[in-house]
Amino acid sequence: MEFLIDFCPYVIAALVLFALGFNLSRRENKMRQATHAAVSLPWYSWEAIASILLIALFSALRYYTGNDYRMYLTNFQQLQADGSLLRGNLEIGFVLVTKLIALTGCHFSVYFGFWGALQAFCLYYGLRHHKQLYCWIGLVLLLGPFCINWLTYLRQWTIAIAFVPMVPYFARRKFWPCLLFTLVAVTIHYSAWILMLLYFVPLVLKADRSRNFYLAIFAVCYLLGTYPVWLSPIASSRWLFSLVGYDKYQCLFQPLIEEHFVFKGYGPLRLIYLFQSLLFIWYYPAMREYYSRDKLFNAFFTLAFVGVCYQHLFINTVYALIRPADYLFIFVVIMMAYVFDYFMAIKKKFMLCVSCLVICSFTFISCYKEVYFLCKPAAECNLLYHFIPQL
């Protein structure tokens, strides 16, 4: 019973976000039918504002939910107690924001709520021209494969979501806005400089590429990741990890240097990762035609495709090697929202129900596995949602 109670906030928040997004999309469609024009409701409609506030509240009220929560909480509380930081190597921008909130005497819920509000604002603003996705975003983000990443990697996922409204600038190769964003992002998480590499990646793909082309690339990455012996020389290059800001994880790569790899079994979680990757790749050609007027669809697909290829290429290594892909996982969430919207539009109800059920079972299975297979008490499981004991 305790397990279900602690899991319910995920479901309730996801369903409310779905209802708000669905209502906004429905109102916009009615307005277009009435005016016979491609008019849009403002992105700051009450449903979007309510969604942002709900995500902020969801972030604010959590307590020891997410693997890194303890570190951020302890830093904040110690800063309020004696003005020092438990972890001294945090980035200057992140430290500045933390100090501004901590030294005003605010409760730590305000601190976590601020980051949740910032993330939600960037996500909804970045998708302001794609409001039909709003209803699906909440479901996939809270119940899908990357919810735990979002709740755990606070700094990295803040930058990842802030990158969403910047995609048009990267797609059009606007150098100065891209550079300015990267410089600001680096002050929140050092590894964000990796995003500048995307400036040189053609995000708008050729329209004549077939489904088999993308499946072949994904298959190669998947097979190479099955037994990554080719990684041993890379893992021994200390300068490489220092360059990308992961030098503190160097000790974790010793098993790779000695060719002791981590072979992950094909349980339900691994299969869901594989299913979602194949799903949006398989339907990409059809969706490309359906969303032909969507100027950012191809860019979103490219970023999601690179993300899942990278993930499966390194999935049998230490997780620190997969961490750079966290900047791209938000686009997998967006692509799954596109897939669900596409299924609804062409009335593929069976595929919509099956795929939505599979994808949105990930958080539940993760929590269930932690409690019932790893025998952790529900109160100690940092994947379940725990409310702060008192305000």
Locations of the language-model features?
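Membrane-interface transmembrane helices that cradle and orient dolichyl/undecaprenyl
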Residues: 163-177
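Transmembrane-helix signature of polytopic, membrane-embedded enzymes
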Residues: 124-143
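Signature aromatic-anchored transmembrane alpha helix within multi-pass, membrane-resident enzymes
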Residues: 218-219, 344-366
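Loop-to-helix entry region of an early transmembrane alpha helix in multi-pass inner-membrane enzymes
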Residues: 92, 104-121
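Alpha-helical transmembrane segments and terminal signal-anchor/GPI-anchor hydrophobic tails
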Residues: 65, 70-73, 199-201, 206-324, ...
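Short hydrophobic/aromatic helix or loop-helix immediately within or flanking a transmembrane segment
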Residues: 70-106
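Short acidic/glycine- and proline-prone juxtamembrane loop motifs at membrane-interface regions
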Residues: 151-157
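Membrane-interface alpha helices of multi-pass inner-membrane proteins
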Residues: 146, 177-201, 312
